[in-house]
Amino acid sequence: SIKKRYPGQAKKVMMGLWGMGQLALTKIIIVVDHDVNVHDMNEVIWAITTRTDAARDTTIINNTPTDTLDPASPKVNLGSKLGIDATQKTLEEGFEREIQEQVKVDDDTKTTVDSKWPSYGL
């Protein structure tokens, strides 16, 4: 995660990581804002689905070194990488919409819903 300070910083982070030793073999990098818990996959997926536009925020690099053991690569040691910028976009990045704040559910509500979950019939 990053505390974004300027447009394009997420892509700069991706490129920097891919340029560092063994991290060059990383197949997919997802960059999120500092408000996203990178250890909680639900939060990462939330960031991707609410802050990413596929055309604007994905980077694909073709014909680049990959892990020898990557079974998806078309050739041994040569394949593609995917970068996803799942950070909140700014006006400077061409984002003209109102930024939506993340709604956090309080612990009491979570406990209530969890205790009643079986009765919902879902």
Model-derived regions: residue spans:
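Charged, compositionally biased interaction regions
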Residues: 1-122
